[in-house]
């Protein structure tokens, strides 16, 4: 039987995680929800992020028996995982910055963490750096603008390079930075553009493959809820908007039949 896997993010950046999982589990039944009503998550309070996460998973679980939930958002994952695991029985997989592998591959022991403002300031990230990158210098850039740049690229196919350059300009002349962690699920979608702007950087690291391996491992022990052999992949957003049709086209290009509006209201 096909497992049903829900992925959610504030936007469409979590599709990079979906893509990595789908490569390993091409026949699974996928649900993807982006919370555009509260996009971006980067500067939302922890209480709001938890409330949104629980509400979204609860609403979708009412209509779809879920075998797994993947929080395809670094910002949310640094906050909401304990609350989701306490509330729901299915496995919950989070997305956190790939600090451990970055520290292992950096030759100069100088790493850049490129993430949202919310992620770079979380104590959880400090703990990861202390645990896995104690011998490294970790520079941080927190950017909400970069998330919006990626969302625009997904809908238009183009990137404003001058706007992108402003995000990373402080790293362009850095003498020893050789590894950059793409600490937001949106950011792998502009990896090529970042490589152009940061030619001295040898490694760009994102957690997609690691998360996919974790999902595959956990599903081996999961008892499947129902037979989903003929179920179509479905996408959800939490608010209608003027660019709804563009977003629906993006989701269809990623293999989702249609984009539905989830009637979700923050409690």
UniProtKB/Swiss-Prot annotation:
Biological process (GO), any one: peptidoglycan biosynthetic process
Active site: 73 (proton donor/acceptor), 184 (proton donor/acceptor)
Catalysed conversion reaction: L-glutamate = D-glutamate
Gene Ontology MF, one: glutamate racemase activity
Pathway annotation from the record: Cell wall biogenesis; peptidoglycan biosynthesis
Binding site for substrate: 9-10, 41-42, 74-75, 185-186
Broad EC category: isomerase
Record InterPro entries: Asp/Glu/hydantoin_racemase (IPR015942), Asp/Glu_race (IPR001920), Asp/Glu_racemase_AS_1 (IPR018187), Asp/Glu_racemase_AS_2 (IPR033134), Glu_race (IPR004391)
Keywords in alphabetical order: Cell shape, Cell wall biogenesis/degradation, Isomerase, Peptidoglycan synthesis
Lineage top rank: taxon: Bacteria
EC numbers: 5.1.1.3
PANTHER family noted in UniProt: GLUTAMATE RACEMASE (PTHR21198:SF2)
NCBIfam families: glut_race (TIGR00067)
Protein family (similarity comment): Belongs to the aspartate/glutamate racemases family.
Reported function: Provides the (R)-glutamate required for cell wall biosynthesis.
Protein name: Glutamate racemase
Source organism of the structure: Glaesserella parasuis serovar 5 (strain SH0165) (Haemophilus parasuis)
